[in-house]
């Protein structure tokens, strides 16, 4: 009761099994599905956390077919980031073009399903609708501002965000440092704020985006100084999302 579980499940199955293997080298897709179905049968709430690699982003239709077939109620696609200290994973890194192409295709499929009353909840779409309807930012980085999350490792080491769990960004240790000091640590604020790319200064979405999450700059947003994947996605999706937000406001407005 009052517990939300996260299920790490990459889509489609070939993408999951290529990178999520057990100690014997076997893919784990089937085992994760078994665990997810156990949660469903028990009536326990869960979200699916799906890593958006370059391979997954190239297959938006296959990803959405899997979402439908598995009857996933809530899903969050997390961009596969370029490595801070793990170059062996660079080959799976998402690109801004891949981000935009994937989300535009998934948005069309999601909107079509929504018109028929059967759309899965996609976190990015939900977050944008909430932002447009209320002005409230519910996701760290969505408006370009970092909010310390204080990730705590088993040895007590504290980091400002799960995207920055490396020695360079270690804020301190929960066993020895006061919580307020950890929240004020430079790595939890100033170090995560990068200067905005020059393309942002003339972008019509600047007030909505604020430059976005600095850690996702090269995967979701900028390629050089001439293209932004997030702006490309918003060009297509924002009119529909704005309409949904307006309809939601009308429905919730007191008589």
Regions found by a protein language model. Give the residues of each.
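Radical SAM/AdoMet-radical enzyme domain recognition
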Residues: 1-80
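Conserved, mostly hydrophobic/aromatic
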Residues: 7, 106, 156
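Flexible glycine/acidic-rich beta-alpha junction loops that bind and position SAM and/or redox cofactors
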Residues: 14-19, 74-97, 120-133, 159, ...
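C-terminal accessory region of radical SAM enzymes
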Residues: 97-132, 163-204, 210
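Radical SAM enzyme core and accessory elements
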Residues: 117, 155-157, 166-169, 195-255
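Short, basic/aromatic recognition patches
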Residues: 131-141
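Short, small/polar residue-rich loop motifs at catalytic or cofactor-binding pockets
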Residues: 143-146
